[in-house]
Structures are given as C-alpha cells and as structure tokens.
Amino acid sequence: MNNRRNGLFRNSLFYILMFLSLMGIIYFFFGGNSGSQTQNIRYSEFVKQLDKNNVKNVSIQPSGGVYKVTGSYRKARTTSSANALGIKSASTKTTSFSTTMLENNSTVDQVSKLAAKHDVKVTAKAEESSGIWVTLLMYIAPVILMLFLFYMMMGQAGQGGGNNRVMNFGKTKAKPADSKQNKVRFSDVAGEEEEKQELVEVVEFLKDPRKFVSLGARIPSGVLLEGPPGTGKTLLAKAVAGEAGVPFFSISGSDFVEMFVGVGASRVRDLFEQAKKNAPSIIFIDEIDAVGRQRGNGMGGGHDEREQTLNQLLVEMDGFTGNEGVIVMAATNRSDVLDPALLRPGRFDRKILVGRPDVKGREAILKVHAKNKPLAADVDLKEIAKQTPGFVGADLENLLNEAALLAARRNKKQVDAADLDEAEDRVIAGPAKHDRVVNKHERETVAYHEAGHTIVGLVLNDARVVHKVTIVPRGRAGGYAIMLPREDQMLMSKRDAKEQMAGLMGGRAAEEIIFGAQSSGASNDFEQATQIARAMVTQYGMSEKLGPVELENANQQAAYQQGMGASAFSQHTAQLIDDEVRRLSQEAHQTATDIIESHREQHKLIAEALLKYETLDEKQILSLFKTGKMPEKDSNEFPSEKAATFEESKRELERREAEKHAQNQSADDKQADSADTTTNVSVAEPSFPSESDASSEVSADSSVNSTANSATESATDSDVATSATGLPNAESATPSSQDDTNSQA
C-alpha cells in the first residue's frame, strides 16, 4: 500500500514540476512584454519627464515604506523592452508609467514644485491596507487554482473518470476477496456433486499441499469451468473462495481491456504480481472468452490489443518464469472459441463441465432456494423437480421467487402448490392474459388445436407424457400443451424424434380435420419440427439417403444464417437435405392425422373440456381419454411433506434400505410360496398404437439436442416452446434453459 502511495506521489510531483517549469520558461522569455501598457521607469527619469512638461497627471500612494508613483504622459511614447536574456523585443507605444521614490519631505517637495510649475495634476492616495500579502495572493491564487485543476484532470485520466489516480490505469481492478463477507460454502451449491469433488482437491491442496507433494503431484495451474448459462459456475468459484481461506482475486475478462493500448497486458502482469505476493492464492476470471478468444480471427488490427492481453496471460500462466502457488480459475459458456494455447495442460490442467442438473440435483437445488421461503404442506419439491427437466439453478431460483411473489400478491402467509404451478406457467410461457378478448371461432380453433397435440402425445407416449394443456393465452401464445419426458434423457433416438415431430404436427392436423382450414397458430410448431428434422438429417445421420455424415453443426449453421460463412456442402446436397426435411415433416403430419382420425371421440371430449375448464392437468386428461369423464375431486390428491433436511433425508434413506433388506430376506425364506402367490399388478392403460415395443432410448447427446428439440440456444435433450394458436407471428416465450419440457402449441 505504501509503495502505491509513493508511486502516486512521484507521478503527481512529476506532472506538477513539468507544469511549473513550462510556466517559468514562458515567463522567462516573454515576461518582459508585460510592461507594454505601463512603463516602469526610474525616479530620475520621472523627474526629467516632469521637468520637460511631458507628464499629464501623477498619483502618489504610500506602499511598504516608499511612495508608489503612477501617472500618464501627455503624448504616447515609443519604448522597447528586453527579456531576461537581454534580447530586445518589438517596440511598443505606452501612455502610462510607474516608479517609486523615497518616503521623505525633500522628494515630495521636489515633485510638488515641478508639478505646480507645469500645471500637472497631483493626486494623493491613502496607503494600501492589504499590504504585500494580498498582492502576492492575487498573483499566486490563479496559479494555485490552475495547478489544482490540472492535478484533478490528470487524476481522472487513468480510468475514464474512475477513482484511480495518475498513471494508475495499468493496475488491475481485482482485489482480494474478504473471507468474512463471503458466506458461500459447498453446502450452498446443490446438484453439482461431481463438480464439487473435483474442486475439493484444489481446496485441500491449498490448505495442506504436503499430502499431494509427497506423491509427486503438483498444484494444478488452472481450472476451467464450462457449461450453459445459469448452471452455477460463478457460484462454484465463490464456494471455493469460501472454503479455501486463501486470498481470492476475482475479475471479469472484459476488465482487462480499456481504451488505452497496452493496458490489458499491464493489468495481467499486475494481477499475477499481486497474486504471487499473496501465494498460495486463487485468481478467478469470469467470462474468460472476452479476452481468451482464438487469435488470428480478427479482420485488420481491431483485435491486436486483445491478442496482446491474451499473450501476456499465456506467459503468466505457464511461461519462462513459472507460476508457483497461484491457481487460475475461469468460467465460460463458450469454450469452443477459446484459444488452443490457453486450453492446453500446464495452463488449464483441469476442465470441469458444469452441466444441467438431473432430477435429484433439481430437487436439491429447490431445497437450497426454499430454505428462506415458508412452504405449505401441499408443496412437493420432488414433484416440481420432475416437472422441470432442463431447468438450471438460475431457472429454479427464479421459479421459487416468482411463486413467492405470487403468494405475497395474494396476501398469503405460505407458498402453496397453486402458486408454484402458476409460477411454472409464467416462467415457461409468460403471464396469463385472462382479459384478452378472443372470439368464439378462434377459441374453438385453439381448443381443438391443443387437443390435437394432446391426443397425439397420449398415443405416442413411450418416452413422454402429457403434463398439462391450456387455452389460456400467455405472452404471445394462445395456448400450449406441455409434454414431459418420463425420465431424464441425455440421448434422443430416431423414433423419439419422429414422435416429437408428430406431436408438433397434431395441432395443424386437428385444424384440418375439424374445420377443414389452416391457421397461423401452428407456425411455432413448424419451426420446432423443422429444426428437429434438419438436425436428424445434417447432424445425427438419421437419413437413409445422405447416410451417417455430419453436414453442419450448430456453430456453422449460426454463422451461415448470419451471412458470415459459406455452406460446407454442394447445392445438390442442399437440395437432398431440403427433400429429406420435407419428407420427414410430411410423414409426421400424416402420422398425426391418422392418430386424430382414429380417436375422434376422445379428441372432441378433450376439446370440449378445454372450452369449459380452459386448463386440464395430467390426471384430468387421462381420465377423459380412458373413461370420457372428468375425475372426481379428492382432497388428498396431492399428499406431500415439507422439504426435508439433510439428516431427515438420510434417515429416510436408511429406513427404506432397511425395509428393502427385510423384504428381500423374507422373499428368500418363502421363495416357493411367493412364486405361487405373487400378483402381477399393472396399470390399466388403453392399447396405444406405436411404432415398436422397444423402450424409447435417445441417440443425440445433450450438446446437440438444442437444435433438434427447441428453438433455444442451450444444449438440451428436448424442448419448451409456445405458439399462439390463431395469433400470427407467435414466438417462443420460454427461457433458454428449460428445454426438456416439450410445450407444444
């Protein structure tokens, strides 16, 4: 701290001395010209001019023990002055003069006699009360003011108006985090157990490196956290800082680059210099893709400064001098654009993928965020976790926050299941538009449209189940149907993809069958279905004509759509792709048409129920499909308990394990009798036509499913989308992270 203050003082003093020197030089050479209006003459010269009758008037004023004499000539006089080097300047004309004389009676009498002789007006003034100090202040005050303004301007120049001082803009903005203020611990990070285990080693190494050093292990140079937005990468870094108890420097990738050339590299050097002084320590760079993008991709010299900063970062992380005792943690959701030199071992030794949580992870995340929220007895967090596949931690936190806001708006003391259900709909499709005026024909069109999605989803239900269908307008959607996967999926099979496309086509097929017309309400359905079909052909190798080849990936497709790249295949191949996409879409449309034609009665029942009740849940939909009636109301329909603590969950797990062990032991003792008395219990379900009896496994990894399953950017295994039936230009109203919920409009 003292070094920084000394450096600041030296820099400030340097600029002040430069300013004073410049003023001295100007005064040294040109100060002689200041007398061009009033000529300063000797007393003898004054007496001589007064005797020659060249003086018009005179003023005499006591000042500091002498008399100050000022006056004016009768005619302008030509004078030439010289500067401090004796060099004469140009001649000037003057009419005023000034001089001093001794404060005695003889000099005063002499001047008075000469003035009376030539009729010169003499004026006597009182002595100045301010004295010489006021005079000095009048001359010095403007100089001091100018120096102060100059100092303030230079102090603000470093950071564009920031709080740093002169020449301090090359210093890093990262400051060691205060461990007392950071309350985040690993226990606050749920749903990422494997990721935490990888980081536990880093924390233990920083606390006690002897266990690792004894085995010849070295401390990792860097840890890269990559994954979709909202999965908790920054929260993990905060938890590491809270657990490690070592100096933690946090900075954003964009903070390295400023308007001045070389500032980024200077800040990198200063950051690592501070971290090494406080070693062992951790440096966390959030959004490192802002400074770590691959070099050589810029056009012209627009990226030279960023590349210079990246080069300095590469050297600091693993250069000639090494980087002992400093661990670099970085977070990004665009690891594909990072420079290969930054990703190699020795710089980022460990790459941790922070993915989307599974159903258990979502339940754990919900429990963490529900700690400070009073939940009613009918809230089942496990059920909510099942209903939110694809949601990340940020989405789940937002879901509970929306539910709490709704409960407060309704003047409730607790957050109940109705609040959470409404919050889920708001997050997926936006707020409800109950007051929107919809004419009778459009309302019927929306009802039969959504019933078409529902019927196809009920028939092709090997992998997905219909969770909810509604015709209440939300956002830009006139209605929507939510299809949930039976369990978390990481892959998508060809059969599953075709079933999803058929479900999306169910709305248009129902409109054509019932009304013999087409509306714009299916536009969003076509958008999703086309994306799935195109991904099947160009990315997943599910086309017999084109075979198992990858013709484009998500990045190439985005660049081509923005006009920044050329197609990677010929025009003939492009025509084949279009033909295959059209064929798959037409097959899905025909499948949906056949299913609705063969289930016209159930389709009508569900549509009429939607017109009456507006929203149907899973139990009501299944009852209408199987029995043709709405289910009876049950007060204990949703039995649930409050969110369990860790110890309660552990005891419950032990109890279930004990019961399971006892049942297995009993089965072994009575194997013969149990074989005769075992009753096969099966749920009575209708016989639904399907393509095969095989289980619906999926064959696309989570990084590719975003194109196949939703209009969102993030990598998922299915989709959430809404479209407004009967409303043109309907757009998806879903967050990019909850793609596992198939909401078809």
From Swiss-Prot:
Keywords: ATP-binding, Cell membrane, Hydrolase, Membrane, Metal-binding, Metalloprotease, Nucleotide-binding, Protease, Stress response, Transmembrane, Transmembrane helix, Zinc. Its cofactor is Zn(2+). It is found in: Cell membrane. GO terms for biological process: protein catabolic process; proteolysis. Residues 33-131 are extracellular. Residues 630-673 have a biased composition (Basic and acidic residues). The active site is at 450. The keyword Protease applies. Residues 1-11, 153-745 are cytoplasmic. Residues 705-745 have a biased composition (Polar residues). It is a multi-pass membrane protein. Residues 690-704 have a biased composition (Low complexity). SMART domains: AAA (SM00382). GO terms for molecular function: ATP binding; ATP hydrolysis activity; ATP-dependent peptidase activity; metalloendopeptidase activity; zinc ion binding. Binds 1 zinc ion per subunit. The chain crosses the membrane at residues 12-32, 132-152. Zn(2+) binds at residues 449, 453, 525. InterPro entries: AAA+_ATPase, AAA_lid_3, ATPase_AAA_core, ATPase_AAA_CS, FtsH, P-loop_NTPase, Pept_M41_FtsH_extracell, Peptidase_M41. Residues 630-745 are annotated as: Disordered. The keyword rRNA-binding does not apply. GO terms for cellular component: plasma membrane. NCBIfam families: FtsH_fam. Homohexamer. In the central section; belongs to the AAA ATPase family. In the C-terminal section; belongs to the peptidase M41 family. This is ATP-dependent zinc metalloprotease FtsH.
